[in-house]
From Swiss-Prot:
The lineage of its organism: Bacteria, Pseudomonadati, Pseudomonadota, Alphaproteobacteria, Rickettsiales. Keywords: Amino-acid biosynthesis, Histidine biosynthesis, Hydrolase, Methionine biosynthesis, Multifunctional enzyme, NADP, One-carbon metabolism, Oxidoreductase, Purine biosynthesis. Disulfide bonds: none annotated. Catalyzes the oxidation of 5,10-methylenetetrahydrofolate to 5,10-methenyltetrahydrofolate and then the hydrolysis of 5,10-methenyltetrahydrofolate to 10-formyltetrahydrofolate. The keyword Amino-acid biosynthesis applies. This is Bifunctional protein FolD. GO terms for cellular component: cytosol. The gene is folD.
């Protein structure tokens, strides 16, 4: 049953287009996009994510700067480091790898990144732009990746019923705003929702971003369900599984993303797409 969505293949298509676009920009401007990644500490999972971002960036011609800092750094000192990156005209985009140590004020750090370099889309100004509908500057990359996958397999979303399980600022909330703009009827559920399966089993599209390994079994879906599994749960060392019981659900739904190989590669692709956007926006600002 060929209903498994290959997120890696879709991401590679985006990266191939970005590579050509970057080559054209270099020929026109003699400059390249540059991504700064701020990593605090040596969390093994964070290190793997950062390496993947750097590897994919280099493949398409984006330079990277890794700023690796000690877990003992104070919030104000980290803000000072981010301000240095904000003022560096050679830096197109900045990401702060999450999670941060509990001693650091995450909200202050995310707010310190210049909105024009906030390619993660976490700055309050960019969040406000998205939810107000006034404009869309930078949007969280996982939400963009989910929307791209959904539209690939369901191009006309008008009137579709979507359940998002998860209310985070990274996935649930921004994706709900994007889907509302596509004229979907969106229901947001979470870990405290009662009778969850009675809600999800009647809907067209289910996005699982609850952070609970293999929680969603076959009873949560119907044969026409499109299932987007955003969960990344590490078990038994380096093994990664999603929020959906993939082995038992896959044959009982219309389409499903695997973990790994589903939304993860799409998130990185849109992170780099946002980096190129930031670079182009900076060129426009310099020309004014």
């Amino acid at each position: 049953m060929n209903n498994i969505i290959d997120g890696k293949a879709l991401a590679n298509e985006i990266l191939a287009d970005l590579k050509l676009e970057i080559q054209e920009l270099i020929s026109q401007t003699n400059a390249s996009p540059k991504l700064a990644i701020v990593l605090v500490g040596d969390n093994p999972a964070s290190i793997i994510y950062v390496r993947n971002k750097i590897k994919n960036a280099h493949k398409i011609g984006i330079y990277t700067l890794l700023v690796n800092l000690s877990t003992t750094i104070h919030t104000n000192d980290l803000i000072s480091k981010i301000n240095e990156l904000n003022l560096d005209n050679k830096i197109s985009g900045i990401i702060v790898q999450l999670p941060l140590p509990s001693s650091i004020d995450k909200n202050k750090i995310l707010s310190a990144v210049s909105p024009s370099k906030d390619i993660d889309g976490f700055h309050p100004l960019n969040v406000g732009y998205l939810h107000s509908g006034i404009s869309q500057n930078f949007i969280p990359c996982t939400a963009l990746g989910c929307l791209a996958v959904i539209k690939k397999y369901e191009p006309n979303l008008t009137g579709k019923n979507v359940v998002i399980i998860g209310r985070s600022n990274i996935v649930g909330k921004p994706l709900s705003a994007l889907l509302l703009k596509e004229n979907c009827s969106v229901t947001i559920c979470h870990s405290k929702t009662h009778n969850l399966s009675s809600i999800t089993s009647k809907t067209d599209i289910v996005v699982a971003a609850i952070g609970s390994p293999l929680k969603l079994t076959a009873e949560y879906f119907n044969p026409e369900s499109i299932v987007i599994d955003v969960g990344i749960n590490r078990i038994s060392g380096n093994k990664i599984i999603g929020d959906v019981d993939f082995e038992n659900v896959q044959s009982k739904v219309k389409y499903i993303t695997p973990v790994p190989g589903g939304i993860g590669p799409m998130t990185i692709a849109f992170l780099l797409k946002n980096t190129v956007k930031a670079f182009k926006d900076s060129l426009y600002t310099l020309d004014k």
